[in-house]
Amino acid sequence: AIHTALSYPETFSSCIALSSALVLYEIAKTGKRKNNVMPEAMVRDVFGNPNELLRSDKNPEILYKRLKEEKKRIPGIYLAVGTEDYLYENNQVFRNFLEKEEADFFYEEGPGMHNCAFWNEYLPKGLEWALK
């Protein structure tokens, strides 16, 4: 959701990002996903060269900065993640980036894992935020 909204800001005014797969941070460090969840060949097919990943348009930070530099409207972001989600740390990194940029975003976290129970609780909250 984040990548799509930042790639097409003329189409999306905001996005709801629940347990976002912001795995680029771990891939850039190690060249692979934690626990080898994704074969290295697939990582390269999806993300390209891990050494260039953080500087590429696969990185939502790059997309955000590009929109800001071009003085284009930047979609708002609702970001929510469970504190037991295996993607929690990656979401923290992106949240910290958004804070530093003083972005239009709303962040929530709470008990939960990467599953429908968490998403079912936070999707209505995200919709309420997006429809304000």
Where are these regions (language model features)?
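Non-catalytic cap/lid and distal C-terminal segments of serine-dependent acyl enzymes
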Residues: 1-132
